[in-house]
Amino acid sequence: AQLVVEQHTVIIDRLAICRMDEKGVRSNGYLVTAWAGDRADACCIIHGYADGSIETPSRPALSASFYANSFLENGQNRYDLSRLATAMDSTGGGHANACGCRIQAPGVDANLETWLGMWANRDEELAIR
């Protein structure tokens, strides 16, 4: 998983985006945020398969997980990441610092575009006051 994180993670506007989809690898946010260090406030991990399903645990559906960077001082409870998880998937959720959802049509790139737009406006859309 470490190698996938190193090779398939980009940081955009302090959000580490790790593409584990189609790779048969999963991770939680600790590995990604530890790798990103102080360059990211949170991460988004994409995992699963485009042809996956919730009925096939060995080949799960595409999904995204969001995690606050708990390695940063005051890294948690700054942004409500569950707003990202529920933006397009009504069954998504979790809590402000760790949450997830299924990728919605038309696909990963469109979902990422929506989430990055929300993240770019995070002080208004996602900030916990």
Regions found by a protein language model. Name each.
Residues A1-I12:
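Hard-cation-handling environments
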Residues A16-R129:
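Glycine-rich, acidic loop segments that terminate in or are immediately followed by a histidine
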